[in-house]
């Protein structure tokens, strides 16, 4: 009789990402407010903030704001398209004690979309 041993694959990261629909257009253009939301999301998720950068893009349907926080554990990113009332959110963490879903939920609560999707993925290696 042959036995099979299951090897537990180590989880090296937790990735939460999603799309937000029906967000207030003015909020999606408010670079400073979006920066504050990302910074607070990092604190809520028990992540250690290293640096926050943001960019404002102008020009028709490509107009929007991107905010990216580098955290010791990985990153948080928001990208917005105000003309579509749409944003994407990406929270990735390698820290065992950080909670990317808490960061995602906070961002959603602040942007108040009419609807949103959320996805979760364990990042692991074999």
Swiss-Prot record:
Cellular component aspect of the GO annotation: cytosol
Top-rank taxon, per record: Archaea
Biological process per Gene Ontology, one example term: arginine catabolic process
Positions bearing the site annotation: Cleavage (non-hydrolytic): 73-74
UniProt keyword terms in alphabetical order: Autocatalytic cleavage, Decarboxylase, Lyase, Polyamine biosynthesis, Pyruvate, Schiff base, Zymogen
Modified residues (Pyruvic acid (Ser)): 74
Broad enzyme group: lyase
Active site as annotated: 74 (schiff-base intermediate with substrate), 79 (proton acceptor), 94 (proton donor)
Named cofactor requirement(s): pyruvate
GO molecular function: arginine decarboxylase activity
InterPro entries reported in the protein's UniProt record: AdoMetDC_fam_prok, ArgDC, S-AdoMet_deCO2ase_core, S-AdoMet_deCOase_pro-enz
Pathway(s): Amine and polyamine biosynthesis; agmatine biosynthesis; agmatine from L-arginine: step 1/1
Catalytic activity from the UniProt record: L-arginine + H(+) = agmatine + CO2
Modification after translation: Is synthesized initially as an inactive proenzyme. Formation of the active enzyme involves a self-maturation process in which the active site pyruvoyl group is generated from an internal serine residue via an autocatalytic post-translational modification. Two non-identical subunits are generated from the proenzyme in this reaction, and the pyruvate is formed at the N-terminus of the alpha chain, which is derived from the carboxyl end of the proenzyme.
Alphabetized Pfam families for the sequence: AdoMet_dc
Manner of cofactor binding, per the entry note: Binds 1 pyruvoyl group covalently per subunit.
EC number(s) reported in the record: 4.1.1.19
Protein purpose: Specifically catalyzes the decarboxylation of L-arginine to agmatine. Has no S-adenosylmethionine decarboxylase (AdoMetDC) activity.
Record HAMAP family: AdoMetDC_1, ArgDC
Subunit organization: Heterooctamer of four alpha and four beta chains arranged as a tetramer of alpha/beta heterodimers.
NCBIfam families given in the database record: SAM_DCase_Bsu
Family: Belongs to the prokaryotic AdoMetDC family. Type 1 subfamily.
Record's protein name: Arginine decarboxylase proenzyme
Source organism per UniProt: Pyrobaculum islandicum (strain DSM 4184 / JCM 9189 / GEO3)
